[in-house]
UniProtKB/Swiss-Prot annotation:
SMART domains: AAA. This is Spermidine/putrescine import ATP-binding protein PotA. Residues 5-308 form the ABC transporter domain. Part of the ABC transporter complex PotABCD involved in spermidine/putrescine import. Responsible for energy coupling to the transport system. Belongs to the ABC transporter superfamily. Spermidine/putrescine importer (TC 3.A.1.11.1) family. Residues 105-177 are annotated as: Insert. GO terms for molecular function: ABC-type polyamine transporter activity; ATP binding; ATP hydrolysis activity.
């Protein structure tokens, strides 16, 4: 996939407070990218800068290799769906979706081509005139002058005929108001069908549910066929079931439309369900960029491990390649490249720990609490050094003495930032 957007050394200062600290990010064409992080981490600020609603304090925003910082928001090939949708309460569903098309000049490309043709015609005519005068200056003989003049007039006549024919053909392609309205009707009904809003065309915004309002906002944003769609936590006001349905719908829309989506959320499930690439942020800085699988299975640091899913976070010491020491024991692992005796952070996911009979595992502990979570049990096991959180489908007795075990690949070693 081609790179569509590049953010280079982006910073933003609000009221003497540094909100963005040197953001560097590449977004590819037809990619679903999610900015994931806690409130105030700077993710919405990035969205607003891309959309043209804010300017960075320093840095560059490149779109297809060209800076767009001086391009007005409405002229960028980017549309935004805001958290509160920003729908027009005085317009019905149909007119909300049609709003962008009604502002659009359907003949703009034809007008541009007419201007291009005219410029080309004038330039060619001027070049012919220049050549004509140069030839006259070289040869002032009567017969030659007449021949040069006739040749010039013939070229000008041919050039003019070609220009007028092209202009006439382009003008014939212009559409009138009736044809424009027919196109609007066709496009609006198409996107209303895509978003599952058939039968609601004449309803006011107040008569819609939260999920329906969100669909209207997305249809309105998509109908102008932007190259990029920015979504600022659009699912935050929906109930759980509807939110899950919309996650799958959004991914399908993105995949089928070929539009690049940049989605902002603090919800890990949203990010992992929909994204090709997740950008984890904290305190105005990018902590890690990767696929949902990479972010979850190989967190770059303690913050990512804590923010993305539940974790057992442990401080340890790297003894050698593939050997790490924690909880008074040395364990085999799959990590290498650290200095000997380097202090490290370790994460072991709750689902990667198994409970076994005493004497059969790596660490002994006592079952301290058991909570049923629907698809698994969440069990706290207190050991001599710490309490481990374990997710398992096997039920164990409270206060029972057991062992826990895990594999070398389940131990994720991280640098301390």
């Amino acid at each position: 996939m081609k790179t569509l957007i590049i953010l280079k050394d982006l910073t933003k200062v609000f009221d003497n407070q540094l909100i963005l600290r040197g953001i560097n990010l590449e977004i590819k064409q037809n990619e679903f990218v999610t900015l994931l992080g806690p409130s105030g981490c700077g993710k919405t600020t990035i969205l607003r800068i891309l959309g043209g609603f804010e300017n960075p304090s320093s840095g560059e925003v490149l779109f297809q290799g060209k800076s767009i910082l001086n391009v007005a928001a409405h002229k960028r090939p980017i549309n935004t769906v805001f958290q509160k949708y920003a729908l027009f309460p005085h317009l019905n569903v149909f007119e909300n979706v049609a709003f962008g098309l009604r502002l659009k000049d359907f003949n703009s490309k034809i007008k541009d081509n007419l201007d291009i043709n005219e410029t080309h015609y004038k330039t060619s005519k001027a070049n012919l005139s220049k050549t004509f005068h140069q030839e006259l200056t070289k040869d002032l003989a009567q017969e030659k002058t007449t021949q040069i003049t006739n040749n010039f007039n013939n070229q000008i006549e041919a050039l003019t005929k070609d220009f007028e024919a092209k202009q006439t053909a382009l003008k014939c392609k212009k559409i009138n108001k009736k044809e424009q309205e027919e196109q609007i009707q066709k496009e609006v009904l198409k996107y209303i069908k895509i978003m599952g809003l058939q039968g609601l065309e004449k309803r006011t915004i107040e008569q819609l549910s939260g999920g329906q309002q969100q669909r209207v906002a997305i249809a309105r944003a998509l109908i102008n066929k932007p190259q990029v769609l920015l979504l600022d936590e659009p699912l935050s006001n929906l109930d759980l079931k509807l939110k899950q349905e919309m996650q799958y719908e959004l991914k399908e829309i993105q995949k089928n439309s070929g539009i690049t989506f940049l989605f902002v959320t603090h919800d890990q499930e949203e990010a992992f369900t929909m994204s090709d690439k997740v950008v984890v942020m904290n305190n105005g800085e990018i902590q890690q960029i990767g696929s949902p699988e990479d972010i979850y299975n190989e967190p770059a640091n303690r913050f990512v491990a804590q923010f993305v899913g539940e974790s057992n976070l442990i401080k340890g010491v790297m003894k050698d390649d593939f050997l790490v020491h924690f909880d008074n024991q040395t364990f085999n692992c799959v990590d290498k490249g650290f200095r000997k005796e380097e202090n490290v952070d370790i994460v072991i996911r709750p689902e990667d720990i198994d409970i076994v009979y005493q004497g059969k595992g790596l660490i002994t502990g006592i079952v301290q609490s058991i909570i049923f979570k629907g698809v698994h049990w969440e069990i706290d096991v207190k050991t001599a050094q710490r309490t481990y959180i374990i997710h398992t489908t096997d039920h164990v007795e409270l206060n029972k003495k057991i062992d826990i075990t895990f594999n070398p690949e389940d131990i994720h070693v991280m640098e301390i930032w």
